[in-house]
Amino acid sequence: MIKQRTLKRIVQATGVGLHTGKKVTLTLRPAPANTGVIYRRTDLNPPVDFPADAKSVRDTMLCTCLVNEHDVRISTVEHLNAALAGLGIDNIVIEVNAPEIPIMDGSAAPFVYLLLDAGIDALNCAKKFVRIKETVRVEDGDKWAEFRPYNGFTLDFTIDFNHPAIDSSSQRYAMNFSADAFMRQISRARTFGFMRDIEYLQSRGLCLGGSFDCAIVVDDYRVLNEDGLRFEDEFVRHKMLDAIGDLFMCGHNIIGAFTAYKSGHALNNKLLQAVLAKQEAWEFVTFQDDAELPLAFKAPSTVLA
């Protein structure tokens, strides 16, 4: 059978919090089958757990948060969640000694390296996928996102940014998902923001960890980072990275075709909740062997040794 995945060993890293600008220690721990993805704040006494759950997601100006019933939150979970989706990690406990996951370089790549360093272990329990059975679409003004039935996982994302630094030909990106494709094509794409917004937020004591080290920063005319872009279409690739993380908030890889126009964290989450709320639109599936499994979810050689 196709088995659930966790880590082989505990790994730790440090980074900076986007909100506070302070050092954060991140610890990734293996977890037993059927645990799911658990985010844990160890700076609170007792520690507080936040299971990945579409209904717990709140989208703020700066990041995605998980919020519990007592209005306690953990922030900036989206890029790590994308890395978990990319590598198909089903069970993990993610600890931080702060209210937020460190921003690292603004992409998912540092988290991918950390997960690969931990090693990935197959558990003796069937991996459950969410398979889309009916088309589900959500809209917000001219923005929209939808899932259609498809035996695999494809993403097609279009942005519409009127900015001199973003060429009109680099505003759409489409891909057939796989762990290899995610690592090569998506994981290194960084978040982005306007210099004036960062300066304004920092003047109000917010976004204190925001810098050229963790984002693409633009003014009204150009990219300000000395090293420029990692991809010509890095902006739309990062929006796809965000979507991959947002859609994994149900804790399961999804079998279907995702298409979006000008979508963001809030609309991606609205789509996921709309799918899950419509019982006839999806089903849980497991697979006995690789021959049945959609190509999108075959484990690459770098993942399962």
From Swiss-Prot:
It catalyses: a UDP-3-O-[(3R)-3-hydroxyacyl]-N-acetyl-alpha-D-glucosamine + H2O = a UDP-3-O-[(3R)-3-hydroxyacyl]-alpha-D-glucosamine + acetate. Keywords: Hydrolase, Lipid A biosynthesis, Lipid biosynthesis, Lipid metabolism, Metal-binding, Zinc. The active site is at H265 (proton donor). Zn(2+) binds at H79, H238, D242. It is an enzyme of class 3 (hydrolase). GO terms for molecular function: metal ion binding; UDP-3-O-acyl-N-acetylglucosamine deacetylase activity. Catalyzes the hydrolysis of UDP-3-O-myristoyl-N-acetylglucosamine to form UDP-3-O-myristoylglucosamine and acetate, the committed step in lipid A biosynthesis. This is UDP-3-O-acyl-N-acetylglucosamine deacetylase.
